[in-house]
Amino acid sequence: AHGLPGVARRFSRNGINLDGLDTWLPGLSLSILTQVAHDLHCAEAFATQLPLGCVVTHEDVTPQFKALALWAKAKGIPTVHIPHANHFIKTRPDVHDKCVCDWIFATSPWMADWYAERGFPRERIKLTGCPNWDVWHEVVQTISKEHARAVMLLEQDRPVVLYCTSWSQSTNLVDDHTVKDRADVAVLEAAKQAGWQLVIKMHPGEPPDWQKRYAEMAKERGVPALVTQSHLTLSVRAADVLVSVGPSNVIVEAALGDRPSVVVPLRGYGFPCEPPWLADPTPEAIQAAVGRVLDNPQLWTEERGRFVQRFAWVHDGGATRRAAEAVREVGKWQ
């Protein structure tokens, strides 16, 4: 903790007010270092029992995974980053600009270009698709809209809007952390005005007790709503349109499930073209955007293939197989 008050003052002189830094940074640093030390000790123990041919991470910018990748590289073990989603970040700098692994197995052409533009060698980027999205290939063949609505006790003949909540991004310095809260209210008001059936699918990272929060918000506004933190596949297949905040990759999963999306964008993030269709965090804007998609289904029918190819590459359920084969190619095996 020595010297931290001085560090805080230097930050403040540069326009970042971090008074009190010394009250929380030492404890946070200690907790991170303890976890990293534990993980690397486990990795060392594992490596003494079995030869390691490759280390694979789903991201390499947070302390634990970055440390693991650096540890492997120091030992000459090939490292692979399989991003768990696309990055829709336009603003730089951003924490995701750097990748420490030897290889990137990209989710999509968009993701491959994104990393290449930030200086990662293109010859070390392999297109595989996103393994955790393979399930959607089977979902669209086995779960119909009618079945999903029956399971979720939704009316068959009234529009269903799926609202996927998000979290305020914190990987760069341009985000507007008020958008998410404004969007929560705007979607509820739009659903009330338009008479939609509303399903609220919580972000996996939100506290589970927020399910009660969303339910109470809907009740206060007189909006019948089904709130869940699970059942994404059923929710997508039951919906006519998905509404999301910011750069969430749930819009790509919705596309794999053959459902269009309206996005309330966060500052600093964006898409090259429609879809998705964008809306400000107001009831009027959201109602207009969703209404346009509902009234013109050909907008989605005509663009779905290009959207999926751009952000998910090949929709065949084979990303896991391709990633495993690529790991076999780049690893060092005895």
What are these regions (language model features)?
Residues 57, 106, 244-245, 280:
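Short beta-strand scaffold positions
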Residues 131-216:
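Conserved catalytic-core segment of nucleotide-activated headgroup transferases in glycan assembly
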Residues 53-56, 103, 160, 197, ...:
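Structural motif
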Residues 98-101, 119-129, 212-222, 237, ...:
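Catalytic binding pocket for nucleotide-activated donors in carbohydrate/polymer assembly enzymes
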Residues 64-65, 111-114, 171-172, 206-213, ...:
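Short, charged/polar "capping" segments at the starts of alpha-helices
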Residues 1-135, 251:
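Active-site and donor-binding regions of nucleotide-sugar-utilizing enzymes
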Residues 222-230:
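Active-site donor-binding acidic/aromatic loop of nucleotide-activated sugar
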Residues 315-334:
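C-terminal alpha-helical cap of glycosyltransferases
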